[in-house]
């Protein structure tokens, strides 16, 4: 596994694939290894009550990963995982997290970066299926970070974060206009076409 992670730029994990062993341990190992080798690490809290015994069990696992994370995605409903929105700056400092994105559904998302915060409104579209919208959003956000040439967290700027948030919101907007989770995920070309309208 070590040889497979080192050439990459980023490792992403989410609580959904950490509900049980051996996947939990493998994800923790990959995140730590990536962090220790100077790679970017992303984590999506993405709490699903049908997959976990209870919220406390998910929070206990999430608490184990924060020290490795550069990019944290958390929904408005999951803010208790980090002690509430007002605690995000202190939480970031405590764990060395560079960017926290708080998703707000159709209302867009907020970013927290380097002592700054901002809001990117959602797009007004005719949604037919929200399945996969969060994954489309986060995939778009992270891909835009990488397309910006970011290879370490020191490369990040507020402008890069804002542009990635705009791109992620567009990706989510394209996704919700189609049926199905995976089939609805947009390509780079589709996102850029949407943004150029």
Each predicted region: which residue ranges?
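Conserved beta-alpha-beta core of the PfkB/ribokinase-like small-molecule kinase fold
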Residues: 18-90, 98, 107-108
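A short alpha-helix capping/helix-coil boundary motif
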Residues: 8-11, 40-42, 150-152
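Conserved phosphate-binding/catalytic loop of the ribokinase/pfkB sugar-kinase fold
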Residues: 1-25
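Structural alpha-helical scaffold elements that stabilize or flank donor/cofactor-binding regions
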Residues: 3-4, 64-65, 93
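Conserved short hydrophobic patches within well-ordered secondary structure
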Residues: 16-18, 28, 137-141
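Short amphipathic alpha-helical interaction patches enriched in hydrophobic/aromatic residues
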Residues: 15, 49, 76, 149, ...
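Conserved phosphate-binding/catalytic region of the ribokinase-like
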Residues: 32-33, 84-197
